[in-house]
Amino acid sequence: TVLRGDVNRIVVGRGTNVQDLTMGHVSHKTAEKPDGAPLIIGDYVTVGHAVILHGCTIGNECLIGMGSIIMDDVMIPDRVMIGAGSMVTQGKVLESGMLYMGRPAKAVRALTVEEIAYLRYSAEHYMRVKDNYLSGTK
């Protein structure tokens, strides 16, 4: 995993896990875009393996499926699930509580109550894995 904040800032929230082979990057500031595009990841987010995050904002309790691509200026609000292999194109603003899938990603349906609960569970699970590793237990 590489999080490269060479020309803008990167923020990773509490309880968030960023899995193997993920690339996080930012966009530089320009006259047209004085803030550029930082990478902001909220609390209790699971970012699956081999995801590309580029200058986007992800809210709290989200799951970004393996192999997904999230482009500049995308706004993902709290409690969103992005299906594996999806691409969210530049500048899209998604809706909370929804499952998005495809290339380009489109809203498929509302998340179930169980799926919404799973978003937090997933992040907490990886926190337990980390704690078990550090304590020498499995």
Positions of PLM-derived features:
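Short proline/glycine- and basic residue-enriched helix-capping loop/turn segments at helix->loop/beta transitions
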Residues: 46
